Every structure is written in C-alpha cells, then in structure tokens.
Amino acid sequence: YGSHTIRGLKQTHQPSPWINDYGQFSIMPVRGKEKVDENARQSWFSHQSETAKPYYYSVYLADHDVVAEMAPTDRAAVLRFTFPESDESGVVIDAFDRGSQVKVMPDSRTVVGYITRNSGGVPDNFRNWFVIRFDKPFSGFRVFNGKNELKGFEAEGEHALAAVYFTTRRGEQVTARVASSFISEEQALRNLETEVGDADFETVKARAQERWDEVLGRIEVSGGTEEQYRTFYSCLYRSTLFPRKFYEIDAKGNPVHYSPYNGEVLPGYMLSLIHISEPTRPEPIS
C-alpha cells in the first residue's frame, strides 16, 4: 500500500494466498510510443485519486494523464481508459518472462497470447491464454521479445510484449474487453463472449456490484463505528476470494477444467482449496 507507482494493471488467477502468482499478465495505458519497458511505462499515482471496491477499480495515472478503470466477471473484465489529446496514446500488454507469446490482429482490434509464468508445481504444458478486444481501431502497434523490437504481428520468446496505439481526443475513452483461459485461446474467446459479449463498462460494473452486494450482504452487523464496519466487510471480502472457480464452460455448456496435476482438460468442476476452506460445500468437484 505504500507504493506510489504502477507498472501495469494485472490479470491474475492466483491459486492461493501463499503460492504467489500464476499465469499473470498486465495491461498498462500509456502516453508515448517509447514507454514500453516496465520502468519506462510506470506512472506515479496517489491513493487520493484511487477508488478500490470489489466490483470496481479506478486510478489516475499522473505521468500519462490517463484514468484507468476496471470492472470484473468470473473469467473476464472490462477496462476503460480515459486519454488526453494525443497521437501517442497506447496500451502495453506485458505477458512477462519465462516464456510467452503475443499476437496483434489489427483488423479485429484484438491482441491474443499466452503466459507460462508461474511459481512452480505446474505441468509442462501450463499456459494461461488471453484475448483482449478493443473498441477503437489501432493507429499503430509494436511487438517485442524483451527489449528487442520485432517485425511483424507476433512475438514469441522469453518475454513477449505488445503495444497498440490510438489517436485520441481529450477525454476520449477506449474500452478493452479481456478474458483468459487455462484451456486454450478458443476457450478464452468463449469466456469473453459468454461473460462480457457486447456489454459496455457500466453494465459489467453494475452486474459485478449486484453480485458482490449479494455476497457481502449475507452478514449484517450493527453496533460498531464506521471504521469498524469498513474493517469487517474488508475482511469478509478477502475471505471470499478463496476457494475460487478453476473451471470453465465449454461450447456445449458443460463445466470443464485444466488439471494442474496432470495437464489434461477434464470434465467437471474444480474449485481451488475447496476441501480446506469449505469441506461441506455441496457443489460437485473433480
């Protein structure tokens, strides 16, 4: 909490509080075509210009004069960036090191790729696939392996990154619809279509708020101060982060999951830490 710089807004499916991250990638709005490396693209921010709720996050990135917002679903999210007037507005997609790929598809305003980064204990075929679809055509793009810029639409190697650019008016908003899958790129796209589709940012935000209000509203407390209420519900929110859904819904509407034990795609549900934190939960698991 003491940090005052942001290098990226990270998508994560952290498997537990003690295993660190798992197949993560980051998305960072920037102003300037040379601001790709994490040190170059980082921006100062203040917690006074930040809003953090279970269903919504917003922050003003001072170095880029950009407001970044996020609203989640189970396996997807919608990000909205409010840019200044610039012909060098952009978004950097960082698939991180230890083996990754990015591919830019300008005709569909889409970036896809995969990440293999993890903290150990995964099968050899472990990958987190992602798809990012923008609502504005690209004015340009670049792809990198580490600090080496590559020709073409794709980068695959130790550390793949992509940057896409836009010409924006002051106050213009660019929306990115994002989803991921541990199964395949096709499944990531299916997750995006199923959970977000054409819904706009405010719709996804409202849906997320409704779901979190239902969860946190299951317990009502009284007799405390506002600060005590805030502490209680903050802790209640954190307690609901695990167990989490590790399964996805296939084209036939059936639950399937990537097994972190043998690397196979198996039928049925899987929920991380379910036996430890909720041993009597009735939902079927495999």
Each PLM stretch: what is its role?
Residues 274-286:
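Single conserved hydrophobic/aromatic residue that forms the stacking wall/gate
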Residues 1-273, 277:
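Accessory carbohydrate-recognition regions in carbohydrate-active enzymes
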